[in-house]
Design a protein with these regions (language model features):
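Membrane-embedded alpha-helical bundles that constitute the cytochrome b-like, heme-associated redox core
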Residues: 1-215
Length: 215
């Protein structure tokens, strides 16, 4: 049966979630890095940038939860043939990436809850994000105390997460250009995005570059 055959590529939903989340994470990190480049009193840029950062972060959270659920309920291609320590490292790095994709926006949500701040959602409407239950009834001094401690934690989580992203990208490029085992191309939506077809054994063929036919 086809359902029992080894998978060679990720399905369309997994690929879509992967690339959309990746782009949103890079956008959100770039926005966060831009905050320090402007004067705190810049009323033209900073409020809109903060609002966009928060809205994108919430999108990352929702899509990451969907990605985790999809990952747990659907098959994926097996890891390539490599040494056991490298397989452990690959599994650990993927697990930590999932933790980062959820923990970074949740920690940001905690900071936002402590502010009781109304934000613009992509310029479409203004909305006060729901406060998490443990924070909703805190007194102002207590909220200020936790805000001053959680905001640096949110920043540190983001930096660690971007290091994981850099490691993930480096590993993907290593598999593609050094090992040539097809790990990268199985997450690409179109064959036209690659320079040839990689077999599971790492051998390269010269099949025509055509869009993937629908299954």
């Amino acid at each position: 049966m086809n359902s029992l055959r080894p998978l060679t590529r990720y399905d369309a939903v997994a690929m879509s979630l992967h690339w959309v989340i990746a782009l949103l994470i890079l956008l959100d990190f770039a926005l966060a890095m831009s905050f320090s480049q402007f004067d705190p009193g810049d009323v033209l840029y900073l409020p809109s940038a903060y609002d966009l950062h928060m809205a994108v972060g919430m999108c990352v959270l929702g899509l990451s939860v969907a990605r985790v659920i999809w990952r747990l309920t659907h098959r994926r291609p097996p890891l390539p043939d490599m040494a056991l320590p490298l397989r452990w490292l690959a599994c650990a790095s993927h697990f930590l990436l999932y933790v980062f994709m959820v923990l970074a926006p949740v920690s940001g949500w905690l900071v936002l809850s402590l502010r009781h701040q109304v934000t613009s959602v992509f310029g479409l409407f203004r909305w006060a994000w729901p406060s998490l239950p443990a924070i909703a009834h805190m007194a102002r001094p207590e909220r200020a105390f936790w805000h001053d401690h959680l905001l640096p934690l949110h920043v540190q989580i983001s930096y660690v997460g971007m290091c994981l992203v850099a490691l993930h990208v480096t590993a993907a490029l290593y598999h593609h250009f050094v090992r040539r085992d097809g790990v990268l191309v199985r997450m690409l939506p179109l064959r036209t995005l690659r320079r040839g077809k990689h077999s599971p054994a790492g051998e390269r063929t010269t099949t025509p570059l055509t869009p993937e036919s629908p299954s």
